[in-house]
Amino acid sequence: SITAAILLVFVLLMLLFSNRSGDFSAMEAQDGVLDATSADFSSAVYEIDGEWTFYPEVLGSGAELDAAKPGERDESIPYGSYRLKIHAQPKQYLTLGGYSFDYSTRVLVNGSEVLEIGKVGASAAESEPRIDYMLIPIYTGEDGTVEVVCQYANFVHREGGGLTQMHLSTAENIDHMRRSRNLYSLVLGGSLCLFGMYFLLFAVFQGEIKYVFLAVICALLGLRDQNFYVLHLLPANYNWAVAYRFLVLMITLQPCFLLLLLQSLYEKLAKPIVVRCYAVLYAVLAAAHFILPTQDIAPLSRIGYYLSMPFFLYLVVQLIRRFWRIRRFEWDDVLVLLGYLLLF
């Protein structure tokens, strides 16, 4: 059917664009030091692997970090500093690009602040959460040595503040990479949202609940990409706390609507009382996203997956029984099950 075919198409579209990682050269930091003296930044973008030096519960740079004791990264640590010393050819203008830390970031190059996303502080009252893409300007100077310090604060939830993937090259190359990624994100997110509007119109005219589920799934898959949802869709002065709650809610709801769609595609697959109980439990879980403090919201998405597992196994058993009873496996079934196999 057209429903099964489009389900498979947008799943393939999502996989196609979400797996476009780019063509990068690898460069590994050792003990917080990156040797880039042999790099040709004019022709390549370098993906920085390895470890930066981490200083737990220290917001400083230069001599302050020299006097501090490095430590191991722990997600329970609410704030800290990452330091990377770059050795490159002298007198080069470079750009370090990457997404900001969860959930506020301040960057210093050779002790001078070059950008701050949100507000970094040693307490929740002193901090303001915000995320964005970072473009960090670097000049290697006479000796080719640069110190980059990324300070973060995370009083939003008990996980986060981990080192993000960084890329180093000329400003032109980093800008080209970012534009390419934005294009993938906009095409994928925009296409899924358009699919969602299409299915919503279909639901209005056809009066079938499965099209409502398809519309919601398309929107959830499109908006769960933070690059599309936060950086391109929301206005610059958005309320961060509300946006964060909706982001976690969209991740939480995804397995629910995928399973509700599956049971709606096959008539009488699940008993109505089972579907109602599952829907009520998930409605309570969804409401909790706007009741609990932000520190307790992130685990709700995992709870949603645990809550969905019994219903998923129930539907698998019912599908096996159905196909065994009718002894027929049609082309529509192949498309639907292939789409779900790719999603899971």
What are these model-derived regions, one by one?
Residues I86-N110, V148-C150:
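Aromatic-lined ligand-binding clefts that engage carbohydrates, nucleic acids, or primary amines
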Residues E28-L34, V109-E147, Y152-L163:
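Beta-strand-rich ligand-recognition modules
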Residues N19-Q30, A63-D74, I117-A125, V204-G207, ...:
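Sequence/structural signature of beta-propeller blade repeats across diverse families
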Residues E159-F205:
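Cytosolic-side membrane-insertion boundary helix
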Residues L186-F344:
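Juxtamembrane segments at transmembrane-helix boundaries
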Residues S1-P90:
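Extended carbohydrate-recognition surfaces in non-catalytic/accessory domains of CAZymes
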Residues E75-I77, Q89-K91, P129, T140-D143:
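Surface-exposed coil/turn segments at beta-strand junctions on protein surfaces, enriched
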